[in-house]
Amino acid sequence: MLLSLRINNFALIDCLEINFGQGLNVLTGETGAGKSILLDAIDLLLGGKAGARVLRQGCSSGVIEGIFSTSTELNDWLATQAIEPLEDNTIACTREFSKKGSSLNSRSRLNGVLVNRQILAELRSQLVEITAQGQTQQLLDPGQQRQLLDLFGGQNLLEKRQAVEITYKEFTQAKQALTARQQSEQNRLQRLDFLTYQLQELTEAELTDGDEWELLIQEQEKLSHVVELQQLSYQATQLLYQSERDTPAIADLLGDAEGQLQTMAEFDSSLNPLLELVQTALTQVIEAGRQVQRYGDNLEADPERLGEVEARLQVLKRICRKYGPSLTEAIAYQEKIQAEYDQLTDGEQSLAQLQESLTKAEQELIKHCGQLTLIRQKTAQKLEKRLVQELKPLAMEKVIFVCQLESSAPSSFGAEQVVFYFSPNTGEKIQPLAATASGGEMSRFLLALKACFSELAPPSQTLIFDEIDVGVSGKVAQAIADKLAQLSQRQQLLCVTHQPLVAALADAHFHVDKVVINENIADPTNPQLDEDLRTVIRITPLQSDGDRQQELAQLTGGHSAKEALAFAQSLLEKSAARRQASQV
């Protein structure tokens, strides 16, 4: 569980300390107030990649520190890394940043012990799971659906899948060996001589990744146009959501439009769908601006690297011309002839022995694939039942979900494809998830999946949601709020939201805002000169009912009118009643 977070000189944060509690922790504030920057900080703390502009402008160093509570399992893992938990059974995770010239350096520590990113990655899986905006799109990938099913099946299924991977590799090797050995002896010797030459050339080229050519071309283009890209990304960021000019950014204009439509919708509810469209557009524009800014932050001129890239491209071009035409085909060709070479050098093994080996390998593969299929079928039934149980309370009472296994040729991942079929409405045929689910339905589907997997995760793990409720309202928003509250009874949740229905159920509520301060240390009372003014992020715990009522009213209608305040008060009263009922 995340107990506290301390941030100094990160992005727009000058100095911040925030304490989190058990249950549902909610962050609210105006669009663009910097709520997601906190999630970026947590991501960086636990090994995320740092961009060139991670430090606050004008600062040469910064730090992010998180204090987490530990569990018996986590303490055992720490012991394997020679790290002792603190006396109060907590762990302090710290990431320090320093800038020297144009380079940014960072160091990570656990309870004062220096650690690498691999250790942080292992720790991250035990401490937090971040559900970012846009993650619903990953659910549409059949490979991701198969992976989710296998993870839900637990250790038994994963071990059987690994056995299939091993036997499939043995099968392909046996097949290649038989084919190679069927050649005549004279051909074998001639072939060996030819393969020796080709393998030497391919080995010297050090081919490892089939995507290297495309990646190098992209890198070459990027390195050749760094200055242009920096300028364009800065301009795009300004246009999208961080304008420093008199002309407002697109996000500002959309925010104004959202405010106008919210007011209009109070008088005409038929405008709510239009309001939702504008809100969705605003969220996407802000996310696009943030990604463009991150892209620009990571750009750096490197002439030496550009020379290395161009030299490497010449080598790969020659290899592809001879063994391709693509690099992937060249690598596959190298693997193929290496296996063929290894078999041709073993002249003692007879054709009959190779045939017998292939037959045994095929039988073994079919056996393991069949066993994996049976486990997946049972797991699919459990996932169907469990996911429907989680979806029904999310305003999807008539939902149908089928995890279908479609037979395919045996491969390294088994003998079936996994496809999620879904029908959210009565009378509608089930269709693949990618063909039928709307944005709001995908958000609920993802939340239901998280609920299913939360039972498999350690209770000490913190679930972080970045606007999981985006694009929904009314009954659906209330259902999502209730589900988040339910999850928070088992695990700590940290949610960024614009939904008053979610915020009302918070066990701890924080308001995020941007403020402008005067940094003229010598004379703070000096007339505010532009160069002394800085924008910083502030976070305020909302501890009184009055403060929370005002915040919920802002989320509801964008102002503190009587109706909004009354609605906010009713939400708080209902939340208190739910909390009291859950404790009985």
Curated annotation (Swiss-Prot):
Gene Ontology terms for molecular function: ATP binding
Binding site for ATP: 29-36
Cellular component GO terms, alphabetical: bacterial nucleoid
One GO process term, biological-process aspect: DNA recombination
Keywords attached to this entry: ATP-binding, DNA damage, DNA repair, Nucleotide-binding
PANTHER family per UniProt: DNA REPAIR PROTEIN RECN (PTHR11059:SF0)
Family assignment from sequence similarity: Belongs to the RecN family.
Function: May be involved in recombinational repair of damaged DNA.
Protein name as it appears in the record: DNA repair protein RecN
Gene name of this polypeptide: recN
